[in-house]
């Protein structure tokens, strides 16, 4: 059971989440566009932070709710371009205080989380796994995450624009 105490209530939502469960920065494949890679490389000076890997959950390959996502992100061999993970499943950029990348450098899918989305737009409901029960009374998720809907919509547009800059991936499931 999740309980908000006076001590935990002063923490950001992501920190409260991390006290209760594995987070979105752990055990999650983070898809990156070439634009994401350029931003991260320019910030870190590194180019060894991504790879092509099959999804942890094989059901991911069966999704058909966003044909554009499938067409531009999943290769014929079932792999996707994702951030590297440490041996325990943590994102390579997850540090003791959270993400080590500044918000404007983080992958676009990370900036959009905890919202699900498809090419048509951003869902009003949070993604499965986001512990909304840890929201402070009277606070909304966007407010708690310090997210602006207009900014999130811009990231969403940018994500799909960057994906479409590449040749579509020929995939048997489309």
Locations of the language-model features?
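Short loop/turn segments that flank or connect secondary-structure elements
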Residues: 1-174
């Amino acid at each position: 059971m999740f309980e908000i105490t006076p001590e935990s209530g002063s923490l950001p939502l992501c920190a409260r989440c991390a006290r209760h469960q594995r987070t979105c920065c752990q055990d999650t494949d983070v898809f990156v566009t070439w634009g994401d890679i350029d931003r991260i490389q320019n910030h870190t000076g590194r180019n060894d932070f991504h790879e092509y890997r099959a999804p942890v959950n094989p059901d991911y390959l069966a999704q058909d709710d966003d044909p554009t996502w499938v067409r531009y992100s999943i290769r014929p061999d079932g792999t996707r371009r994702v951030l590297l993970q440490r041996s325990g499943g943590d994102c390579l950029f997850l540090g003791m205080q959270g993400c080590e990348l500044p918000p404007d450098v983080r992958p676009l899918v990370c900036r959009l989380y905890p919202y699900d989305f498809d090419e048509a737009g951003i869902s009003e409901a949070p993604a499965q796994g986001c512990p909304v029960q840890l929201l402070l009374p009277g606070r909304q998720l966007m407010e708690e995450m310090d997210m602006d809907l207009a900014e999130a919509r811009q990231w969403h547009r940018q994500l799909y624009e960057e994906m479409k800059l590449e040749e579509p991936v020929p995939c048997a499931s489309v």
